[in-house]
């Protein structure tokens, strides 16, 4: 996740004119949540409902310990927290099983609405998430350290819809730049 968030920070820090359109990135990783944000639920029902300024605006569910959450820690104090930034992040720390209280749709229903997915795995023996994206006609970015990425690189001369970024122990900054460039 670090290289994905770093790529979003790189996009947000770059010239806004470089982006072809605004970017809304969802980080959908279950974490220690204690239920959906009440203010967000109210806003989804009524666009005039007030948002709670004491809650981090980039999150869909309350966290049991937001001060210890690595994703919040990573985006805090960056342009990703700026509501005027052309790059926005929404952290969804809940299983998307159709009853999360915010989306109330399962993962696959939400996946179909994505323009692209990013799974910059450092290591996954196979890594089904990029495969699921392609199965739902959503282009994906993965790495040469994920089994699926390796398989695509080895078996598909033209792998349209799947970008495989070369990743190793020493090239995180290059991976960040390549992901940012691909999203751009």
Where are these regions (language model features)?
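Conserved catalytic-core segment of nucleotide-activated headgroup transferases in glycan assembly
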Residues: 1-108, 167
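A structural signal for short secondary-structure junctions
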Residues: 19-20, 111-112, 134, 157
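Acidic donor-binding loop of glycosyltransferase active sites
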Residues: 108-125
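Catalytic binding pocket for nucleotide-activated donors in carbohydrate/polymer assembly enzymes
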Residues: 120-184
